[in-house]
Design a protein with these regions (language model features):
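Small-residue (G/A/S/T)-rich helix-start motifs and N-terminal tracts that mark the onset
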Residues: 1-128, 135-142, 155-285
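Non-cysteine beta-strand/loop elements that form the S-adenosyl-L-methionine
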Residues: 144-151
């Protein structure tokens, strides 16, 4: 495996590559043909993640967003995005875990969010796992993408019997993204100053991100962008699972592009990134 990783060349992802995976609607489309994303994010500890993931997904462009919650989180999402639906139903893709602790019993709403995660196995559609849902990696039958940072990936691998520290992962992100993809049987987007998207025999490298992206909620925005793209590309992903990596790379490219537009070399917030998602997409297509 070590020799294979050393020889593996990464594909440098560009705007031209991204354009291929942004589905522009035609006059024949309607809301249900443009992708329905099921979202299970946010908790009492991190309620803002529910809003950020939902707003980012809607800003990216999709047909329907279904937010799954039996708590006050639904009211927060509806206040910020009245176009969201807040009842269960058929979905074309899942986004789960952002703003949810991996400590299932830390509080009542977190426990409830983990119960909602079980819906992912009931509808076998392409799935994005973040933060508190990362432990589902390798446990689902559908094409699955995980979006950890180094600390989360280290914890996940240690729990699966692979001893590694977050410092080691940060020192060689390329290697560990590929190790994780092979050992877990999923597509891995490893977040960092340089983001890698890995499958065992397939590696994409994103341009170095603006340092201003190191801000609270930025990862939730990324998850929402990718979730929307997965829902609009779900047929392509089911036909060729490598497209999940390409769609994830497109989401990361849009995320950084929106951050650059929002920043102009000055501080930004997660909310300000969302405002520039449509402009970032317009420049790509």
């Amino acid at each position: 495996m070590r020799r294979k990783i050393e020889l593996m060349k990464s594909q440098r992802w560009t705007a031209k590559d991204s354009k291929k995976h942004i589905i522009v609607p035609s006059e024949l489309d309607h809301k249900y043909s443009r992708g329905t994303l099921g979202v299970i994010t946010g908790s009492a500890q991190f309620p803002g993640a529910a809003v950020l993931t939902s707003k980012a997904a809607i800003a990216t462009g999709l047909g329907v967003l279904r937010f799954h919650s039996s708590s006050g989180l639904a009211h927060l999402v509806l206040h910020a995005s009245p176009e969201a639906l807040v009842q269960p139903g058929k979905v074309d893709a899942w986004l789960a875990g952002s703003g949810v602790s991996d400590k299932k019993y830390s509080d009542y709403t977190t426990w409830l969010r983990h119960r909602w995660f079980k819906l992912m196995s009931a509808q076998s559609v392409p799935t994005v796992l973040d933060a508190g849902a990362l432990d589902w990696a390798g446990k689902l039958t559908q094409p699955t993408l995980i979006t950890p940072h180094a600390g989360e990936l280290a914890k996940l691998l240690v729990n699966r019997g692979i001893q590694v520290s977050s410092e080691s992962i940060e020192a060689d992100s390329k290697k560990w993204s590929m190790v994780a993809a092979e050992k877990l049987g999923v597509t891995v987007l490893l977040k960092g100053s340089t983001t890698y998207i890995a499958k065992p025999d397939f590696l994409i490298e994103l341009p170095k991100a603006t340092p201003w992206l190191a801000t609270a909620g930025s990862g939730d925005v990324l998850a929402g962008i990718i979730g929307a793209l997965v829902s609009t590309n779900y047929i392509e992903i089911l036909n060729d699972e490598n497209n999940l990596a390409r769609v994830a790379a497109t989401g990361a490219f849009i995320h950084n592009s929106a951050a650059l537009l929002a920043s102009k070399d000055s501080p930004i917030s997660a909310t300000s990134i969302i405002r520039f998602i449509p402009e970032a997409i317009r420049k790509i297509i």
